[in-house]
Amino acid sequence: MRILGIDHIGIASADLGKHIEIFGEKLGLEIHGFEEKDPYGGLRTAFARVGDTDFELLEDRVPDGDQKAIDQRDIARFVARRGPGLHHIALRVADIEEAMRDARAAGLHVIDQAPRPGARGSKIAFIHPKSTGGILIHFVERPDQVQTAHATGPDGGTVEPD
């Protein structure tokens, strides 16, 4: 498994606008990558950049008091049970299928059977927090890294993908 670095840290929010204000205006971080899957409800995300890492700000919009909708939405359920805050840590990997195989071989419970679509055109897969000491971790393979993930070795020489 080749972990390239921390891709982002996920923050579950009940009010995305409030977290954008905190991370953008108050902390002075660059806000980018706003996505809204459905303007009438569903997941909204934005990213706040610090160095080479992002905070992924996530809000599930569900009708007030709709317990069924809350139970069916990961972020809404998390916020209802624990309140807003740290949700996950995402590790950038060179090859998500390899990372999933290696994690399973190491005895980690990979939730996803196959990679699923993530934000910014990425592929993602989650590891169950019960197998990681209570921390939700997910792998991220980004389309912009696929061509460059194996381009240079530690000595600067070209390295071919496996």
What would you call each of these model-derived segments?
Residues 52-54, 59-80:
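A contiguous binding-surface segment within folded domains or other stable secondary-structure elements
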Residues 43, 50-52, 81-86:
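Short connector loops at helix/strand junctions that flank enzyme active sites
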Residues 2, 13-20, 31, 46-49, 56, 69-162:
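Vicinal oxygen chelate
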Residues 1-2, 18-21, 25-26, 30, ...:
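Intrinsic disorder/low-complexity detector
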Residues 1-43, 48:
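Long, hydrophobic N-terminal alpha-helical segment
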Residues 7-10, 90, 140:
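Residues embedded in well-ordered beta-strands within globular domains across many folds
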